[in-house]
Amino acid sequence: MQKTCMGVINRKIDQDIFGELATSTVNLGAAVTSNTLRVLRGKTVLGNNDVPWDGNITFVLTPATEAFMMGENDFSSRDFTMNGPFDYADPAWKDRPIVYRWLGMNWIVHPNLNGGGGPASATEETYMFHKSAIGHAFNADDLEAKAGYDEEQDYSWARCSIYMGSQLLQGSGVVIIAHDGSSLAAA
């Protein structure tokens, strides 16, 4: 139960960070389907904003964005990446997002990233950012993860509490790349 409770905390941390990334004013415009050129455009915008290309760039994307990128030979081929999307056996069974490494960036596919439009919608937002552009802090000393059993009432319980916060530190270090994933929505 404590593990499940901490999973809830971790998802809340993700949502806080995504909420701050969404406040960036740098974007690539209207939502279209993703491809290699669009990703390279985002990378170029970061470079033009003097963001250091030091291995600390992350691209957080939706499952629909990943699906479109899998159709790009540059992304899915072993010839172009050291840590590609097919390097992990059965990633769906892991309780954390899988990290790919491509174009000098960490790629994280996150199922709860949608920019408010819902999964596989025409308004998905993905974020390309430098590590120093976003901050997240929590009070580790006050983190509580407790579980127990009440014999009198015959029920189990779990509770986690944490004091935390996220903040966009450098707006120019984040690029919002809107993606149209509507063609992959369930019928």
State each model region's role.
Residues E72-A187:
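Sequence/fold signature of self-assembling virion shell proteins
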Residues L21-P97:
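Extended, solvent-exposed, turn-rich assembly/linker loops in the middle of proteins
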Residues M1-V26, A30, R38, N48-P63, ...:
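Long, contiguous amphipathic alpha-helices that act as assembly "spine/axial" helices in icosahedral shell
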